Design a protein with these regions (language model features):
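N-terminal membrane-anchoring/stem segments of glycan-assembly enzymes
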Residues: 1-92
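Internal catalytic domains of large membrane-associated glycosyltransferases
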Residues: 14, 67-297
Length: 297
């Protein structure tokens, strides 16, 4: 992977998007024309319209990811770097602090803390575990699970590497759910950390991955968020194993394809991402809208 900073001007970014969406449009148009030939002739006009509309929606979605994957394949084949990101050596020392956040809501405490311990041990092996702290942010409403969380936390603290702190906090009221949980953390403790890695309750991330994300954020001051593509693991059923295999085979290709045309304008998937705390606090607070959900609140 190239360590040089690749900057794309707006025109090149626009050209990338025109290519991907243009190919998607042409593919969908040709497929739709073919589809109209096989629609039963005795169908009503309304039925034909609905069949064509549903076909266009589903085929366009597939075509978008198909062409994104084609471009992603060549990006990986020629080892092109991510535009706008300067890659750094693996032994780059961190001078910043990162909080690893795991919001939970009536989860299995043993699994939550087992995953955190595994990640903490892996981080400690990198030799830079002291740059990270871990937080369990609980919105649990079940009293039994709440007690179990605290018990597991006390046990986990005894097993944690000495270089990494593990904190536990439960809110009495789970206002705004997960987003409110993250907001509460930022308001009370965000000033102590440069970055935060937001996990899901069942997330399991490699220590080297978390370290690399923190290194990239520290050395790319213009970057506000880096999203790690999630991958399914630990499945037992045949269907789950098939999903895991598929994700392993073409997951990186799809991710590279999305990065090809989204560049620096991608969306936050809700977890498995590192975020610049100060920028997040300054720019990502949303007002409460009038009216009832989903259009208000």
């Amino acid at each position: 992977m190239s360590e040089e900073l690749t900057v794309l001007n707006p025109k090149r970014i626009r050209n990338r998007r025109v290519k991907v969406f243009g190919l998607m449009f042409v593919s969908t148009l040709l497929a739709t024309i073919k589809w109209t030939y096989v629609i039963p002739t005795d169908s009503t006009l309304l039925t034909k319209f609905l069949m064509v509309a549903l076909f266009v929606l589903t085929f366009a979605w597939i075509a978008l990811f198909f062409w994104s994957s084609i471009f992603g394949f060549f990006e990986l084949l020629f080892r092109r770097g991510v535009p706008g990101i300067t890659w750094v050596p693996e032994d780059t020392k961190l001078s910043t602090r990162t909080a690893v956040l795991m919001p939970v809501y009536n989860e299995c405490s043993r699994d939550v803390f087992a995953n955190l311990l595994a990640m903490a041990d892996d981080l400690d092996k990198t030799g830079q575990g002291k740059a990270f702290d871990m937080f369990v942010l609980s919105d649990t409403t079940n009293p039994k699970l709440w007690v179990e969380e605290e018990r597991c936390w006390l046990e986990a603290k005894k097993l944690m590497p000495k270089t990494i702190n593990l904190y536990y906090r439960r809110r009495a009221k789970n206002t705004a759910r997960k987003s409110g949980n993250i907001e509460d953390f930022c308001v009370k403790w965000g000033c102590y950390y440069d970055f935060m890695i937001v996990l899901d309750a069942d997330s399991l991330m490699n220590g080297k991955t978390m370290l690399k994300m923190a290194q990239l954020m520290e050395n790319n001051q213009h970057t506000g968020i880096i999203q790690a593509p999630p991958m399914t693991v630990g499945g037992h059923t045949l269907f789950a194993r098939m999903q895991q295999f598929a994700g392993k085979v073409y997951g990186p290709i799809v991710a590279a394809g999305l990065a090809y045309w989204q560049v620096g304008d991608s969306n936050y998937w809700g977890h498995n991402a590192i975020i610049r705390v100060k920028a997040f606090m300054e720019c990502c607070g949303l007002p409460v809208l009038e009216g009832k959900a989903p259009f208000g609140g």
